[in-house]
Amino acid sequence: MEEAEYESVLCVKPDVHVYRIPPRATNRGYRAAEWQLDQPSWSGRLRITAKGQVAYIKLEDRTSGELFAQAPVDQFPGTAVESVTDSSRYFVIRIEDGNGRRAFIGIGFGDRGDAFDFNVALQDHFKWVKQQCEFAKQAQNPDQGPKLDLSFKEGQTIKLNIASMKKKDGAAGTPRARPTSTGGLSLLPPPPGAKTAALAPLSGEHLSVGGSVVQPAVSPSSGGATVSWPQPKPATTATADIWGDFTKSTGSTSSQTQPGAGWVQF
């Protein structure tokens, strides 16, 4: 079911005059000077409404709001509303009754601003109608709309102006100063497994091995340039029985041999 159309009010003017106009003998436009402007046929209120795409010019009584005449407008500018050639305050409209009969009458406004608002209200409505028709066509045929072409034409060039950029402090690529140490000289420990070179004593110094002073041996062939230090002897391995201390401390108990003499008694 189609959505019901509602009637909206576009313009209301409280003072409008209606005139009888003589029939137009030629194709030239209407002239307000040919009307009896000092003797209007009717005076009242004008109201412009819209229902769907059709606008309606309604002439109503100022007090009761009773409808005097109505002019449906389906196109503007068009034959339903025409401007006169000698004034901007007067128009010719085509009124219709419920039986399909039509007649042309003249209307006029006392204020030029009211005539301007009347004209603009009709223009805005039909501008909206035109946009709605275009949107409906685009919705039905979306591929037929104009496509935006952003490609370069043959021989077309562009020019880019790039301003010089200043390097900021601490930017990438700028070496930073290493912070100075406030303490003494700090050395990293040697890596695990590294061999440390033995330090040779200076002249006049003696090497102490096992509590005794050892003099370095000088090689006669080298002219005293090479010093050969004796290597410390490995500790002698005790040849005594490892259980000797335990057997000595037992004293007389060792004379009493228990069964299984191969075991040491604690």
UniProtKB/Swiss-Prot annotation:
Domain-level remarks: The WXXF motifs mediate binding of accessory proteins to the ear-domain of AP-1, GGAs and AP-2 through hydrophobic interactions. Selective binding to the GAE domains of AP-1 or to the alpha-ear domain of AP-2 is tuned by the acidic context surrounding the motif and the properties of the second residue of the motif itself.
Region (Disordered): 164-191, 244-266
Motif WXXF motif 1: where in chain: 243-246
Principal location class: membrane
Ranges spanned by the short sequence motif WXXF motif 2, renumbered to the chain: 263-266
Cellular compartment(s): Cytoplasmic vesicle, Clathrin-coated vesicle membrane; Cell membrane
InterPro entries: NECAP_PHear (IPR012466), PH-like_dom_sf (IPR011993)
Family, as annotated: Belongs to the NECAP family.
Keyword Amino-acid biosynthesis: no
Top-level lineage group: Eukaryota
Record-linked CDD domains: PHear_NECAP (cd13228)
PANTHER family in alphabetical order: ADAPTIN EAR-BINDING COAT-ASSOCIATED PROTEIN 2, ATP-BINDING CASSETTE ABC TRANSPORTER-RELATED
Free-text function comment from the UniProt entry: Involved in endocytosis.
Entry GO CC: clathrin vesicle coat; plasma membrane
GO biological process, one term: endocytosis
Phosphoserine modification, residue list: S181
Biased composition (Low complexity): 247-258
Protein name per its UniProtKB record: Adaptin ear-binding coat-associated protein 2
Subunit structure: Interacts with AP1G1 and AP2A1 components of the adapter protein complexes AP-1 and AP-2. Interacts with the GAE domain proteins GGA1, GGA2 and GGA3.
